Structures are given as structure tokens and as C-alpha cells.
Amino acid sequence: MGGKKEIMDCIRGNKVLVPGTYPGYGLGMAAVLATLDELTKDDCAVYKQVFKVQEKIMDGLVEISRKYDIPLTITEANGVFDTLFGIPGGRRRLYTDGELVGFDKNIVNNFQRYMQENGVFLMFGGRWYVNASHTMEDAEKTLAAADKAMKALKENNYNYIAK
């Protein structure tokens, strides 16, 4: 953190409390810098791999949803995406509340249950996070489970029927 001398002098003299995650904690700051160094190595190869895995999963989910004629929109940011069942459209951005018309939380919840039956545990609500620990093999396994889950959804009129 830095700024004008007169402001920084107030902080240095303990006249102003400066809360934060790392103020005055050199070891923590060193850890942050080391982490950033790792993440930016090789022209940010870690991030590129995360994005490749995410792309594979998102594209695969859209393809599977079309195979079973299940309406699905995926909204995304780097490292995270949402599956919005009940809204047709594939991968796209949504800008207004009106674009959420048709979203069906029950389909999302039932999809999640079928995914769990097939060994993939998702966060509640349809949000997916992809990180550096995920591999292309993980993406393939996820899509195989998603195919089974969407098939079951379609066969059971979007309801969950336990095995």
C-alpha cells in the first residue's frame, strides 16, 4: 500500500487503524507474491489449462443438453460458470432479470442429485468452479456423468427418481 507522505505518516504513527488481510504481515505478503509468481509462470500456463478444462466442460454440457432436448443456458466468467436449466440458449451472457424467465431450480437440483449418483459432486444451485487441480480426464468423467444425469432427467420428466 502506498500514498501521499502526509497520509502514510498518519498510518505509520498509529493514528489511523488500517485493517486488512496482510498489513504489517510480511510472511503473508511473501506468500501472496510467491503464489502470484507461480500462477504467472510460463505465460500464465496454469490459467490457460483451467480455461481449457472449463471450455471442454461447458461445451460438452451444451452438446449433451441438445442431445436430450433439455433447455440450458450457461453463463460464464474465467474459472466459474452457472448452469441455468429451463432457459434455452447454450453459452451466452444474460443482462436482465427478464432473461431468467423459465429458470427451473428443480431441474438444477435434480441434475445435481443424478450427478452425485454418478460420482460428481456439484455445488448447490448450479454454479461450477474450475481450478488448477482439474484435468481433461476430470472433464471427460464429468461429461460422462452429465450424459447419464441428463438422460435420467429426460426419461423421468425432469424429476429425480432414486436408484
Where do the language-model regions lie?
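Conserved N-terminal phosphate-binding loop of PLP-dependent enzymes in the Aspartate aminotransferase
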Residues: M1-K163
